[in-house]
Amino acid sequence: LPAFLAGGFLAAAFPVVYMMVKAEEMTALAGNPINILMSANWQMMAMLNILISICGACMMYHTEYADNGMQKMSVLPIRQGSMFFGKFLIAALVLSTMVVIEMAVLVGCAKYWFPSYVFDLTEILKTAGFQIIVTLPTVMLMLVIASACKNMWVSLGIGVILVFTLSILPQDNIVLSLFPFASPYQMLSAAVEN
C-alpha cells in the first residue's frame, strides 16, 4: 500500500512541478483551471496510474503463485471468482485513493495559481469519478492477464507493452479510445465535447 500511495503522490507532483515551470503560460490561458491543468498533465498522470495498477495486479497474483499458494487456496471453501473480485476491489480502492490524491493536488494548484478559480465540488467529483471509471477496465483486464500468467515478469511485460502500444492510438477516435489500456487517457472535458 505505501508503494501505491507513493505512486499517487508522484503522479500528483506533476502538475505542481509543471505549474512552477510554466505558471505564466498556463495562467494566461482562458477557461476552467481544472480543465487547463488536466489537459496539460493528465496524460502523464494517467500513465503512472496505469503502470502502478499493472505492478499491483502482477504482485497480487505473484504472491499467490509463489510457493504454490494458488493450489493451497483452491482447497479453501472460497470460490476463485470471489477471490478475483476481492483483488479487483482492492485494486479499485487503491486506484480511487490515487485519483483522489491527484484531484486534491489539482484543486490546490488551481487555487494557488488561478486566483479567480471557484471551487466546485460536483465538478471535481464528476471528474474524479470519470477518471476512475475509465481506468477500471484496464485494472480488470490486467488482473485477468496476471491471473493467467504464473511468471510475474510475463504479465508485467504484457501490461507494459499494452500501455505503450495503446497509448499511441488517436484519442479523438471514439472506438479506439474505448480500448482498456487507451481509455484512462480520456478526460471528462474532452468526452463531454465529443
Pin down the residues of each PLM region.
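Secretory targeting signals
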Residues: 4, 8-55, 85-150, 190, ...
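C-terminal halves and exits of single transmembrane alpha-helices
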Residues: 79-98, 171-179
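Pore- or pathway-lining transmembrane helices of multi-pass membrane proteins that form conduits
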Residues: 4-10, 150-167
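Helix-loop-helix units of permease transmembrane domains in multi-pass membrane transporters
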Residues: 60-92
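Terminal transmembrane helical anchor/hairpin motif
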Residues: 18-37, 156-194
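Hydrophobic alpha-helical segments typical of transmembrane helices
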Residues: 57, 68-69, 141, 180-183
